[in-house]
Amino acid sequence: VCTRVVYLGTNDRNVTGRSMDWKSEIGTNLWALPRGVNRTGQAGANSAEWTSAYGSVIATGYDISTTDGVNEAGLAVNLLWLAESQYPAETADGPAVSLALWGQYVLDNFATVAEAVQALTATPLRVATAEVPGEGRMATLHLAMSDASGDSAIVEYIDGQQVIHHGRQYQVMTNSPTFDQQLAITEYWKQIGGTVMLPGTNRAADRFVRASFYIDAVPKTDDPLLAAATVFSVVRNASVPYGIATSEEPNISSTRWRTVVDHKALRYFFESALSPNTFWVELRQIDFSPGAPTLRLKLGEGEKTIYAGDASSGFERADPFPFLGVP
């Protein structure tokens, strides 16, 4: 359910792209969240407490969680499904954070991947999950980070323990199996060579292999237009046609939307499967100062609302959405 890639261009033109694959309407809107906001982890006893040090533009899931976004320092997060995720027990140590706030915690507190990894390694979070709205099953996600330097990290919770893969080489993430197994599968396909044959199904392991080959094979540039277009083309290649879903395999679902982050330009692109246009947000045009209003760009049912080009001025004041807490 989703594919994420990082393009390492020339002259630090580093660009992250992802698809959001989900079998039903996910109720996404874009939000601009300022600095200086006090938050808690909303996960019961010992919940983390912090004040946002960085403003961010995010895409929500159901308007109760941060599923994707980038902060004003150029740090991006992408949350993707991972069925194998097992989060710490309620009795485990560490500051507690609801899964809905996990990505926002990173965007609020850190400027770089290295900074986030250092903090999360020193003090692992006790991430707590809840049911997906209307699904009757627990949400299970892993988190990817990337920054303006091209650095990346993948954070997973396996058997209740935090596992972090940190390095520029971790440019691709999809879904099952766990990241270490994805890397092993990709090594096998490297021996065959992508120009000879690539696996073509919608399964997560196949999307991982295709995305890994193409994000490495495409030409590298510092041209912001070409870089963004290139990343969109790779993400589209790993997308799932609209209307395709496999009920017994939630890892295979229709692509609902795609995002691309130009870390150098601080530009956040959004493309809905049900809208004819790609549009973008210029983070440098948004007031993230403490006390600035929370802003929302309404995408409508099925993200069908049509925007084109720079949609930064389309954001409107709104009451902050409530993150889904875990009792």
Regions found by a protein language model. Give the residues of each.
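C-terminus-biased signal that marks the final domain/tail of proteins
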Residues: 1-15, 128-140, 148-150, 170-327
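Short, surface-exposed beta-strand-loop junctions and turns on beta-sheet-rich folds
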Residues: 22-24, 83-85, 160-162, 274-278
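Proteins synthesized as precursors that undergo proteolytic processing into mature forms
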Residues: 96-130, 224-234
